[in-house]
Amino acid sequence: MTVNSEIARRVRDLDADSTETAEDAQHALTAMGPDVLDDVIAAVPGMGRFGQLCAIEIFTALGDPRAADILISLLNSESDTVRQWAAEALGELAVERAVPALARAYEAFRQRGESPDHSEGEGIRWALTRLGARRVVLPPRSAALRVSSGDEAYPLWPMVHLSEIVEDLAAHSQAVLYFQIWQIGTDGRRFWHGASDVDWDLDRSWTWDRNVAHCRDWALLAAEAVDTAPGLVASISWIGATDL
C-alpha cells in the first residue's frame, strides 16, 4: 500500500461508524505528520460530528495554520461541541484573522440565550482571550495570588485563597460562574480533583450588580464546603458585564 492510499484510507476511517476505528485513524494520521493535512481538510465538510472532532484534534496536534479556514467554517456547525472545539483550536493555533468569526460565533451564542457557563461559550471566550481580542478583568490582588499554570488565559489559585479571590472579583464587578479543583503533579501537570456540589445561574432580567452579588454569595457558600488541603489549586470561571 502506498503512503497516499494509506492516508486516504485513514481519512475515510475518521468518519467510521465505530468511534474506536475513528480514533485509531486520528492517532495514525497525527503520527504521519503535516503531509496528511490537505486530505483531512478536504474531507472535513462531508464528515459527521465525531469525524470532525477527530479532525480538529489532528489540526491542533500538528499545529499547522493551513487548517485555519476549515476551522473557521466549523464555527457555523450545527454541533455545539464542534463549534467549541473549532474555537479552541483557532486559539491554540494563534489564528488572529479568526477573531471576527469568533466574535460572530459568540454573539450567536449570546442571542440563543445560552447559559454563560456552557462549554461552548467558555471555549469561544477562551479563544478570544488567547488571541488578544477579549480583555479579562483580573484585579491586582488576585493576580498577585496566582500560581503559574503555563497559560495566562487559564490562571490557578491555591485553594486557601479561593474565598478571597471570589470576593476580589466581585468587588471589581466580575461574576463568578463556577470553580474547579485541581491537583498539581510533580511533573507540573494538573489533574482534576473535583468541583463544588453547589450550582448557581445568572438571570438576564436582573441588573448586572445583582447578578454579581448573587454569584459571589453562592460561590462563597460553595467555597466553604470544599477541600482546601495543601497542594490543591482552583481554576475559576468568571465574566464581565459585556460577556453576558
Residue ranges and their predicted role:
Residues T2-D13, P34-P45, D64-N76, V95-Q111, ...:
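Amphipathic alpha-helical scaffolding segments comprising HEAT/armadillo-like alpha-solenoid repeats
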Residues D17-S18, M47-G48, E78-S79, F109-R110, ...:
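Short inter-helical turns and helix N-cap capping residues of alpha-solenoid HEAT/ARM repeat scaffolds
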Residues T21-A22, Q52, R83, E114-D117, ...:
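Residue-level detector of extended alpha-helical repeat arrays and alpha-solenoid scaffolds
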Residues A25-A28, A55, A86, G121-I124:
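Conserved hydrophobic register position within alpha-solenoid helical repeats
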Residues M32-D35, L53-C54, Q84, E152-D201:
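Amphipathic alpha-helical interaction modules
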Residues D117-V136:
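Eukaryotic acidic, Ser/Thr-rich intrinsically disordered low-complexity regions
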Residues C215-L244:
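Amphipathic alpha-helical binding modules
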